[in-house]
Structure formats: C-alpha cells, structure tokens
C-alpha cells in the first residue's frame, strides 16, 4: 500500500515539475557514470576554500550523487548564459545555482522540486532615501543579464513604461552587492537570502521594496531526454524531505543570518582590522583541531577580544571563564590573554567530546557552544525535552526551538536541572555563527589578495573559470 501511494505521489510530482512546452523525443535510457552539476559561485550556492567546499546547492548535490552512487563533478560557470548553453549541449546534467522558478525557465527547461523560497528585493545602500515605489528611485538599477530579475523588471515595465535598467554580463550578484556598498552603482535586485548573507560583510546594504514574494528555488534539467534523471531527483527529494535534510540545510545556511545588527557588524569588522592581529597567532596556536576562526568568534562574543573584560557574575578574560572552570582546566590567570584562550579552547573541546556520538559532526560545535554558554546539563535537558515533543534531539534546528522553553515553568519544572536562559543560548550561538562566517570571508579575501599579489601573471582570462567571491564543573556554564 505504501509503495502504491508513493508511486502516485511520484507521478504527480513528476507531472507538476515538468511544465515544459518542448515535446519529448524518443527517450534513450542513459546510465550516469558521474553527476555533472553546472553551478555559479556564491556563499549560498557553491564556495571553495581551504576549509573545503560549501553551499546549499553543493551540499544537496553531494547527497544526490551519493544517492545515484556516482562521483560528483561540480562545473562552475561565469554567467547564466553559459550555464544554459552547457545544459543544452549536454556538457552538464543539471543546473544547481540558486535559481528561482520563472515563466521563461519553465519554457526552456524542466524544473526540479522546490528547495527553499526567497523574495526578490530592491537593494540600495545605507544613507540613501528609502524608495516607496519602483518609480521613486534616485538613480539607476543594475542587474545581471539572463537573471530572473530581468524578467521581473520586464513585467514591471509594462505598468511603468519609463522604467529602465542596465544589464551586465561580466559581474555576478555578489559583485553587484559590493558595488552598492562601495557607491559604484545605485540600485540592484537580489534574492532576500543573498542580501541576508552578504550584509554580514557589507553592513551598508539595505533591502527595500519586495518585488516578488515566495519564489521557489529549483534545479534545472534538460527539456528532453531527462525522464530518468527527473524521476531519480524526485525520489531523492522525497527521501531527503522526509529525513529533514532540507530543513537542516535551510537552518545551516539561512537560520542564523536573519537577525542583523548594523552597529555591531560595523564594530566587528573594525575589530578584525585593528584588534584581531594582536591575538590571531594565539587563536591559531591553541585552537588545535578546532577551526581557529570559530574560537576567535567565540572570544569576540564573550569579551570583544578584551583580555581585561569582567562581568558582575565573576567571569573574566578573553574567553570569560568562571573561577571554578579556570581551576579545573589549569588556568591560573584569567586576565592573561594566552592563558584565557588556551583555557577556553580546552573547555570548548571538552564540551564537544562530551556530546553524544549521535549528534552529527557538522552540528556538534553549535551544541558545544550552547553548553559553553548555559552548561552541558541544561543542553541535555533540552535534548530530552525535544525528544518528548517528537523533535530530533540531535538536530540544532530543533534544539534551538526547544531551548527557550527552559525559561517557562510549564517546561523547566519537568527537567532535571530546572530553569535556564535558553533563548540567550540560541542568540549566543547564532551570533558566533555570524561572526565566524564574517571571519571566514575576511580571511579568504586576504588570502586571495595575497595570492594575486604574489602571482599576477596567473590571473584567469576572461574566458577562464569564474573567480571565487570572498576568496568567501562541566555541568555549569563557564
């Protein structure tokens, strides 16, 4: 019975996702020997760095290749026109590039099932008048050619004939956002998720008018000879949807970037430039197997990299350690920057090691940071509470829903360790994740700049690969 129902659902999804006017020619079965995924560079799409590859589309592509039991080959292109041409010429099997569903794309390609949703927003910089209408602009709009934003503007132009814009083929969305911040262009249009991610590094970005709401982000398949791949994609999507993978990736890439503090972001960027150089070597030395940037981000959240920081509750130093914790891990002077960093790293590592093995490696740091903030015992209380509510106690996306409940008597009176400021722990972890992302971006920018200065003759030609943007007591709190 279950198989029968699944077959019906699969058939329905296949019909719904096809939506292509091109007539199928005779389908020739083709067994993939590798999955060739065409993509664009971007922090939420596909990024490469010394720490490995990342991106929503990349992570999903890895899982899809595993599902198909074939090697994955990511093929980055410089613009959408090249991507489309490559798919039509069978140089790639699928496009996974953070693209939204549009009428034009439905006519040209087969569209996969929805991955997540975004709004299209008008972007401008801090200090410019807030536009109240698309006709109320004090400058030009610049967008990427062949993008969904061109389709949106074309539709708006029918109602507003005087609306004009510039299209560029030699820039990507990240570059246009940087040009907004640097006062090189006046306006652009971007997906809301892209703005949320990039304003961590470009705090002067502002999003105003919502031009399109709740657009599905999808993958693109060839309009013909793709029945087999589409069927496999739908079955894979159904499996990962039920497993919570889509929810996990949404939380991983977008869950911590929605909260934004303009003043704090600018202050952090200044501190990276003026304060961090004094302590970077200490973070790198004592991080051990941890990413030094996560350790540095935690320290900034704790003390703003002030070795003399003190709080009324008695915590002190760069990592704001309590006296009992300092004694436990062998720290004699909490106000000594190196001792504090060494102690904080040891304590954080201990929190990670204490966590159950059932928590995935990719999420252990967030559980450990919550333990660092409110204590391991309270995190265990929250995990048990999550399980009682039929949520996943090993998924950070579910734990962050439950932690604030530890402040409500209805819930904490049923726990072993009682009341805890769980909402503060969620804010604490999200803030560190934002600081960490910013540190990664700045670090990659610096490495890319140094590489360019050392090897100027090796710069890619205009026809070469696209550059990478941004290269992008243990039961008590400490």
From Swiss-Prot:
Record EC number: 4.2.2.n1
* UniProt-listed InterPro entries: Lysozyme-like_dom_sf (IPR023346), MltF (IPR023703), Solute-binding_3/MltF_N (IPR001638), Transglycosylase_SLT_dom_1 (IPR008258)
What's one GO-annotated cellular component? cell outer membrane
Q: What is its main location?
A: membrane
Q: How does it sit in the membrane?
A: Peripheral membrane protein
* LT domain: annotated span: 258-478
- Lineage from the top down? Bacteria, Pseudomonadati, Pseudomonadota, Gammaproteobacteria, Alteromonadales
> Reaction catalysed by this chain?
Exolytic cleavage of the (1->4)-beta-glycosidic linkage between N-acetylmuramic acid (MurNAc) and N-acetylglucosamine (GlcNAc) residues in peptidoglycan, from either the reducing or the non-reducing ends of the peptidoglycan chains, with concomitant formation of a 1,6-anhydrobond in the MurNAc residue
The UniProt record lists the keyword Transferase = no
In the record, the note on similarity to other proteins reads: In the N-terminal section; belongs to the bacterial solute-binding protein 3 family.
Cleavable signal peptide: 1-22
Q: Where in the cell is it found?
A: Cell outer membrane
Protein name, please?
Membrane-bound lytic murein transglycosylase F
Species name = Shewanella sp. (strain MR-4)
State the encoding gene.
Answer: mltF
């Amino acid at each position: 019975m279950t198989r029968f129902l699944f077959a019906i659902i699969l058939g329905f999804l296949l019909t719904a996702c096809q939506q292509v006017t091109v007539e199928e020619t005779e389908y020739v079965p083709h067994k993939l020997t590798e999955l060739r995924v065409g993509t664009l560079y971007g922090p939420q799409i596909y990024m490469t760095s010394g720490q490995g590859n990342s991106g929503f589309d990349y992570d999903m592509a890895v899982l899809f290749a595993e599902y198909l039991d074939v090697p994955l080959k990511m093929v980055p292109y410089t613009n959408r026109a090249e991507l489309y041409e490559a798919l039509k010429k069978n140089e790639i099997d699928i496009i996974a590039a953070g693209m939204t569903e549009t009428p034009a794309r439905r006519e040209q390609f087969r569209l996969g099932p929805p991955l997540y949703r975004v709004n299209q927003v008008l972007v401008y910089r801090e200090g410019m008048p807030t536009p109240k209408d698309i006709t109320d602009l004090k400058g030009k709009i610049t967008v990427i050619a062949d993008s969904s934003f061109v389709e949106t503007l074309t539709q708006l132009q029918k109602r507003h004939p005087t609306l004009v814009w510039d299209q560029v083929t030699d820039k990507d969305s990240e570059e246009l956002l940087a040009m907004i911040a640097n006062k090189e262009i006046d306006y652009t249009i971007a997906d809301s998720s892209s703005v949320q991610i990039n304003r961590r590094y470009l705090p002067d970005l502002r999003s105003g008018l919502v031009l399109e709401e709740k657009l599905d982000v999808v993958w693109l398949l060839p309009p013909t000879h793709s029945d087999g791949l589409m069927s496999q994609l739908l079955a894979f999507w159904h499996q990962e949807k039920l497993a919570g993978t889509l929810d996990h990736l949404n939380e991983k890439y977008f869950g911590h970037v929605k909260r934004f503090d303009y003043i704090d972001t600018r202050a952090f960027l200044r501190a990276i430039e003026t304060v961090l150089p004094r302590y970077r070597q200490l973070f790198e030395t004592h991080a051990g197997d941890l990413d030094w940037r996560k350790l540095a981000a935690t320290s900034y959240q704790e003390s703003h990299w002030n070795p003399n920081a003190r709080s009324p509750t008695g915590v002190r130093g760069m990592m704001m350690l309590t006296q009992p914790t300092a004694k436990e891990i062998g720290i004699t002077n909490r106000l000594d920057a190196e001792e504090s960093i060494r102690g904080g790293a040891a304590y954080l590592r201990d929190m990670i090691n204490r966590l159950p093995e059932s928590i995935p490696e990719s999420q252990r740091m967030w559980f450990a940071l919550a333990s660092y903030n409110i204590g391991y015992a309270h995190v265990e209380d929250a995990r048990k509470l999550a399980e009682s509510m039929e949520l996943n106690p090993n998924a950070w996306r579910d734990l962050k829903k439950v932690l604030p409940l530890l402040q409500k008597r209805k819930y904490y009176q049923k726990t072993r360790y009682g009341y805890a400021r769980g909402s503060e722990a969620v804010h604490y972890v999200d803030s560190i994740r934002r600081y960490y992302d910013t540190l990664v971006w700045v670090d990659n920018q610096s490495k890319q700049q140094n590489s360019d200065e050392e090897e100027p003759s090796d710069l890619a030609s205009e026809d070469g690969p696209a550059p990478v943007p941004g290269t992008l007591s243990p039961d008590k709190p400490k």
